[in-house]
Swiss-Prot record:
GO cellular component, one term: extracellular region
Sites where a glycan is attached: N148, N164, N181, N324
Entry-linked SUPFAM superfamilies: YWTD domain
Similarity section: Belongs to the major royal jelly protein family.
Name recorded for this polypeptide: Major royal jelly protein 5
Tissue: Found in and secreted from the hypopharyngeal glands of the worker honey bee (at protein level); expression peaks at 8 days post eclosion. Expressed in the brains of adult worker bees peaking at 12 days post eclosion (at protein level). Expressed in the spermatheca of adult queen bees (at protein level); Expression levels are higher in mated queens than in virgin queens. Expressed in the heads of worker bees after eclosion, expression dropping with age and detectable up to 26 days of age.
Factors inducing expression: Unlike other major royal jelly proteins, not down-regulated by the ecdysteroid 20-hydroxyecdysone (ecdysterone or 20E).
Keywords for this protein: Glycoprotein, Repeat, Secreted, Signal
One Pfam family matching this protein: MRJP
InterPro entries registered for this protein in UniProt: 6-blade_b-propeller_TolB-like, Royal_jelly/protein_yellow
Segment forming the signal sequence: 1-17
Length: 598
């Protein structure tokens, strides 16, 4: 059965948003062990190809292990992507985790290759913050163009790669008036969400945390829109944050975002805030950006702490990192957006210090599970192919049967027509025979009468002959009238027989049509039942969450201890996470799920 993986990236940096959830005492869930560590690093290192090249990179300042911090993670098939914001000493900003292991952990390989790590002429990938993989196997990369978190090196861009070929499909350079706040001149693109309806009709939402704006990119016409709202601004009350008991200051606006596949709501929070907001994206799909069309909603101060990373499950459960709690919280969007409807699904002060990235995965991390998923998918496809072939054979058999019935009907009609023709011929011959016989008898009668008349007086004979002629004419007319009536009756009988035969033919055709309609309805019902079964199987698929965690305050203060683990990628089954929580399925959710599927 296909599963999804929720990828949570935890950095040794403290996140700033914690929900108002609290861990219930006597809870049967072991929150400390609810997520499994997949990868971990003391520091990030790269596969340079040889020790000589690594030493040369270190001596030139191209690589400095103290300046490399993971910021986002995603997975496609066997590749796990990791982004590293560009600082001096970062050799590559977009990478995949290799099979090679160094002193710090798994080595990173630049994606697609080392040539794209060259940023000085702005032709490569300068500084990748967030990435997203859509359902059409495309990798979207948000390149801020900023190095050292402050210096604009190149114009911000969107890079799009085909993951099947690792070839770039598109590179979109953002206009300056879109990328920065015109009033303050500030700008910093740090987060993106991709909404792909089809390969052309795709929308990308980007968060500008320094310029307090939401940028919308329409792939169909390559247009940009910069949206502003006070819900994007940071809250002055929360610019001083706490992480693992240490405080730091940040004045960042809209940051973490998540898109609901069920309601099309885009959920977001400013980094320096404890509020949760959302906007419905349907107006954006229609290119309606007016104030009357776009409505921003949400609840202020709904969290107990700041929240950075957010992700949405396919069933409408929002997961969010809780900075000062070293935890991950949840809320089911089928419930009212209230503090009491939120809950905590994972908490660990060692492995979940600050969750800076989370992803939902279509496939589990295990290769064995991947193979099982592919085998199940192939078996389902083969079963559907076999059923389609059987349906086609059944239709062909029915068509052959109908052809045979049509041939039999035509032969029956021809036989009936032949019989009618023969009957008509025989009737005609009988009529002629009767007429000949009657004529012969009339002639004999007349001869007899003539003989008798010879013995009679001529006058009497003449009178008698006149009377007889008149009688003969009357008899002949009566005979003709009788024959005409018989012919009319025969014709009426034949017409009645033909009408009855036509009625029988029409009845037979109607019966065949009714049978075919019933068969078609049964076929449609069978196909519908198969689709329903497939939909039920899809709804029953598991999801896996993957998270990236690190110590945020260490990142800001640049005082990591690289002799201990600082960065971790963790994973967990979503159903296991939300089990026995307020975020589990409800009747309201099931009803909304059915409406969404319809």
């Amino acid at each position: 059965m296909t599963t999804w993986l929720l990828l949570v990236v935890c950095l040794g940096i403290a996140c700033q948003g914690i929900t108002s959830v609290t861990v219930r005492e006597n809870s049967p869930r072991k929150l400390a062990n609810s997520m499994n560590v997949i990868h971990e690093w003391k520091y990030l290192d790269y596969d340079f190809g040889s020790d000589e090249r690594r030493q040369a990179a270190m001596q030139s300042g191209e690589y400095d292990h103290t300046k490399n911090y993971p910021f986002d993670v995603d997975q496609w098939r066997g590749m796990t992507f990791v982004t590293v914001p560009r600082y001096k000493g970062v050799p590559s900003s977009l990478n995949v985790i290799s099979e090679k292991i160094g002193n710090g952990g798994r080595l990173l390989q630049p994606y697609p290759d080392w040539s794209w790590a060259n940023y000085k002429d702005c032709s490569g990938i300068v500084s990748a913050y967030k990435i997203a993989i859509d359902k059409f196997d495309r990798l979207w990369i948000l390149d801020s163009g900023i190095i050292n978190n402050t210096q604009p090196m190149c114009s911000p861009k969107l890079h799009v790669f085909d993951l099947n070929t690792s070839h770039q499909l598109k590179q979109v350079v953002m206009p300056h008036d879109i990328a920065v706040n015109a009033s303050t001149g500030n700008g910093g693109l740090v987060s993106l969400v991709v909404q792909a309806m089809d390969p052309v009709n795709t929308i990308v939402y980007m968060a500008d945390d320094k310029g307090d704006a939401l940028i919308v990119y329409q792939n169909s016409d390559e247009s940009f829109h910069r949206l502003t709202s006070n819900t994007f601004d940071y809250d002055p009350k929360y610019i001083k944050m706490m992480d693992a008991g240490e405080s730091f200051t940040a004045q960042d606006g809209i940051f973490g975002m998540a898109l609901s596949p069920m309601t099309n709501n885009l959920y977001y929070s400013p980094l320096s805030s404890r509020s949760l907001y959302y906007v419905n994206t349907k107006p954006f799909m229609k290119s309606e950006y007016g104030a009357n069309n776009v409505q921003y909603q949400g609840v202020q101060d709904i969290f107990n702490t700041e929240s950075i990373a957010k992700i949405m499950s396919k069933n409408g459960v929002l997961f969010f990192g809780l900075m000062n709690n070293s935890a991950i919280g949840c809320w089911n969007e089928h419930q009212p957006l209230q503090r009491e409807n939120m809950d905590m699904v994972a908490q660990n002060e060692e492995t979940l210090q600050t969750v800076v990235a989370m992803k939902m995965m279509h496939l589990p991390q295990s290769n064995k599970m991947n193979r099982m998923h592919r085998m199940n998918r192939v078996n389902r496809v083969n079963r559907m192919d076999r059923m389609d072939r059987i349906d086609r054979m059944d239709r062909m058999d029915r068509m052959d049967t109908m052809d045979t019935m049509d041939r039999i009907d035509r032969m029956d009609r021809m036989d009936r027509i032949d019989r009618i023709d023969r009957m008509h011929t025989m009737d005609t011959m009988d009529t002629m025979d009767r007429t000949d016989k009657m004529s012969s008898m009339d002639r004999m009668d007349r001869m007899d009468r003539v003989d008798r008349m010879d013995t009679m007086d001529r006058t009497d004979k003449m009178s008698s002959m006149d009377r007889m002629d008149r009688m003969d004419r009357v008899d002949t007319m009566d005979t003709m009238d009788t024959m005409d009536r018989m012919d009319r009756m025969d014709r009426m009988d034949r017409m009645d027989r033909m009408d009855r035969m036509d009625t029988m033919d029409r009845t037979d055709k109607m019966s065949r049509i009714d049978r075919m309609d019933k068969i078609d309805r049964m076929d449609r019902m069978d196909r519908t039942n198969r689709m329903d079964r497939m939909n039920r199987m899809n709804r029953q698929m598991n999801e896996y969450m993957m998270a990236l965690s690190m110590k945020l305050q260490k990142f800001i203060n640049n005082d990591y201890n690289f002799n201990e683990v600082n960065f971790r990628i963790l994973g967990a089954n979503v159903n296991d996470l939300i089990m026995n929580t307020r975020c589990a399925n409800s009747d309201n959710q099931n009803n909304n799920q059915n409406k969404h599927n319809n």
